Amino acid sequence: YRMITTPIQNSMGPSCADPRSGEIIQGDVLFYSNIIKLLHNWRFVQTATVDPKVRKAVFDDETMGSSLRYVAAHEIGHTLGLMHNFGASYSYPVDSLRSATFTQKYGTTPSIMDYTRYNYVAQPEDKGVALTPPLLGVYDKFAIKWGYKPIFDAASPEDEKATLNKWIKEKENDPMYKYGPQPFINEV
C-alpha cells in the first residue's frame, strides 16, 4: 500500500502484466490522501438513516476500518486482474437487501468489484441487516478461481478452455454470477 498526497479523493489498484503471457508481474494499491473524507461522506449519505454510529464527524476505528477494508479489497481485486463488475448492482432483489438473514449470509453485493459500497436500501425497521459489502463476494471468489486455479489435466492453455467454459456454463443462469463491464464513453 502507498499513500499519495493529492487533493483528489480516490484510490486505485494498478498492475503491470507481461504482454506475452498476460501474467501479472507487479501490482500496487494506492490510497489518495483524502480517502478517509471520501469514505466518510459515502457511508454517511448511504447509511446514516439506519446507522447511528455514522452520524458524526469522525467515525470510530471499527466503522472506518470496515470501509477501508472494502476499498483495499476492491483495489487488490484490480491488481489481480479483476475488472469492475457492474452486473452485481442488480443481482440481489431489493427485499433481500432488507433481510438480515440474507445480508448476513451473502453480504450486500456478490462482487466487491462493483460500486455497491453500502446498503442504502436498508430502512430503520430492518434490524440486523448488513450495511457493508462482504470482504469477497461469491462472484469474486468465482472470478479468482477462473483466473488462477490450475487445471492440471490440461496440456496447454488451449486445452484449459473446455474446463473454463464449463465453469462459466454452470453459473450462467445464477444472478449472483452476473458480469457487467464498465461502460466507457469515448470522445467523438
Show the residue positions of the predicted features:
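Metzincin-family zinc-dependent endopeptidase catalytic domain
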Residues: Y1-T79, G107-T108, Y118-V121
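Generic structural "secondary-structure junction" signal
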Residues: M3, P19, F31, H84, ...
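Alpha-helix termini
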Residues: I35, L39, G87-Y90, V94
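Catalytic Zn2+-binding segment of zinc metalloproteases
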Residues: I76-Y92
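Conserved catalytic/binding loops enriched for acidic/polar residues
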Residues: S89-V188
